[in-house]
Amino acid sequence: SLVAHVVDGSLDGHAISGMAGVSNIGTERNWCGHPFGAANWYAFGRLAWDHRLSSEQIADEWLRMTFSNDDRFVERATSMMIASREAVVDYMTPLGLHHIMARSHHYGPGPWVGLSQTDGRADWTSLYYHRADERGIGFDRTATGSNAVSQYCPPFRDLVASVETCPDELLLWFHHVPWQHVMKSGRTLWDELCSRYNRGVESVRAMQRTWDDLSEYVDPARAEHVRALLRIQEKEARWWRDACLLYFQRFSRLPI
């Protein structure tokens, strides 16, 4: 069943139902720190009332009430918002990588966390999750590894259990894949990993250009605030890309 059918009560025939979530609001003047961060708070409330809404519909509503009702602004800003999640995935954890952030504060890259004996319990470290070595990268959760894949029902279990059919975005979560494995794109795994990290950085730069074009529809203070935050994001996207690729290159021994 869809989670939505649990929330609306239709799965078990409940007349009264609800949902709970962790808020991202705080003491900042704009509540969420980032002007666009409030969109997540708004989306939670809207989905609690109507889970059938699409991301595009929610973004359209929020943008019109927050920045401008001009269609020329809303159309491009909506596209920017919809693309933003995959941009972050690309420059932080592409192809199903996971939990490779720095220790304790979780801010910034840390694929090397686990090399030191002071890095805490093994299954909380980056090394435990990415398992990069000279042969490849990724966590084998199939029958030849942890067999975590057995917890899923078919047909999803069968889909992800095979390297050949597993979606790219889940590949390294379920499989330890050789560096020279040929991906669906025709690139090797290593080249695809490099491509995804670079694509993430370029996506942020595209958002910067889009926001520069859209700033005329927004008051100067908020326009500059978002512009400044995008500069930080672009810098941090490069930080993630460079740190992760240079670390993984120690094992792949292939050119970036």
Residue ranges and their predicted role:
Residues 2-256:
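Catalytic domains of carbohydrate-active enzymes that cleave complex glycans
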